[in-house]
Amino acid sequence: MAVTETTSEGWFSRLGGAIKGVFAGIILIFVAIIMLGWNEKRSVDRYNTIDYAKNNFVETAADKIDSATEGKLVHFNGMTATNDVLTDKDFGVTVNNSLSLNRDVEMYQWKEIEHKSTKKNAGGSTTTTTTYTYEKGWASGLINSSSFHESGHDNPTVLPYKAEDTVAENVTLGAHKIPSNSASHLGSAEAVALEADKVTAPVSAIIKGNTILYNLYKEEKAQQAKKAFEANTNANVATTETTATEATATPEATTTPVANKAAFSAIEFQASEAAPQIGDIRITFKKHPVCNATVVAEQKGEEIVAHKTPSGEFYEVRTGLMTAAEVFKAAEDENAMLTWILRGLGFLMIWGGFGAIFKPISVLADVIPLFGDIAESGISIISGLLAAVLSFGVIAIAWLFCRPLIGILLLILMGAAIFGIITLISKVRAAKKAAAPVPAAEPAPEQTPAA
């Protein structure tokens, strides 16, 4: 079932909010400029660090520690290894020959989906219609149902277990030690095959594959039922033992066997895989087995550490058997990708900042909704153009400090682009003016001859 709410905001209220947004827009642009400048410096420093590493690394064997390469940037690869036995402290799940043991926890809960639509009214006010719908699904964290707009969609208030990673502390690659924080992410995750008799699981849990499944509410009932069952069974056994003792004391009595304790069955309290219910908890286990890995880092005895260069630190531990050239290429690609992502983010921030600065104009025009829509479209285009020019300019200026020649070239390109755009606009305007029909001249008034 859906719940719908309708709210209205007056024109003066919208205008006041838009004026306040101007200050937020200025701050957003300022932050974006700083981020763009920092990103260019970071990118150049990382490029120089990788370039330095390319020209100053040495090859070394993985299976021995060479004193000749102590303190140098070295490249080696091979199979990782560990003797650590990783154990989940809550469920007793254990794995060998693994770099990490990962536990994921999800709960089946209600989710509130919000959909908004806003309509502009004559006079500048707006009417917002918000629709809330509800659906069930798996979530890794608790969803607070007390804030839902419709009652009857109650979620549990506790999640007994949380996601947790157990990592191997003693990992080696040949004769070299690999830090646990580097080793734990190597390789690909694999499902852990759980053995029911070796797992400490809730009473009503279903254990299948790498998953433990049970219902939070049903588990409480299962535990209560188990306690009652065990208490009743213990009482019956005690009565049987007493009767057997008395019978043994009578010479003519026959021997009465002592009853065995029956096993408690929690089938009726189990969750359903096919039809999950609110409160179902799904716990899955995965591991990262030992695998081939490649290192380019500084050798410090048996350990590897980040190698300091004039422009930064270089430290790479990657999955697979890779040449040094492949490691450097991967590092360069990652640096380029991050650089462009941050450039794009900076551009969007500046675009949004200019949009906020010009927002009062569109709100003023919203007195007539059609004019407001036209103004909003124009503001979006202008804000985008200004954002492109400003972000490009910031990047160019940043390069002036890092690589002056490249910075100058970028500024020249930016100036040429701006000049080209202005020239094109001028030509379009001139062409429109020339194509416009020239109004016909009015005939001169006839002169009356003098008498």
Show where each model-derived region lies:
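Hydrophobic alpha-helical transmembrane signal-anchor segments
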Residues: S13-R42, L345
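Cytosolic-side membrane-insertion boundary helix
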Residues: F12-R14, F314-G352, E376
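Alpha-helical transmembrane segments forming the membrane-embedded cores
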Residues: T7, G346, G353-A451
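Low-complexity, intrinsically disordered extramembrane tails and loops of integral membrane proteins
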Residues: M1-W11, N210, A235, T239-T254, ...
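Soluble non-transmembrane domains of integral membrane proteins
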Residues: M79-A81, V85-K300, I304
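Juxtamembrane amphipathic/hinge helix adjacent to a transmembrane helix
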Residues: A2-T6, V317-F328, G384-L390
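Short extracytoplasmic
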Residues: N55-F91
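Alpha-helical transmembrane signal-anchor/signal-peptide segments
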Residues: E40-D63
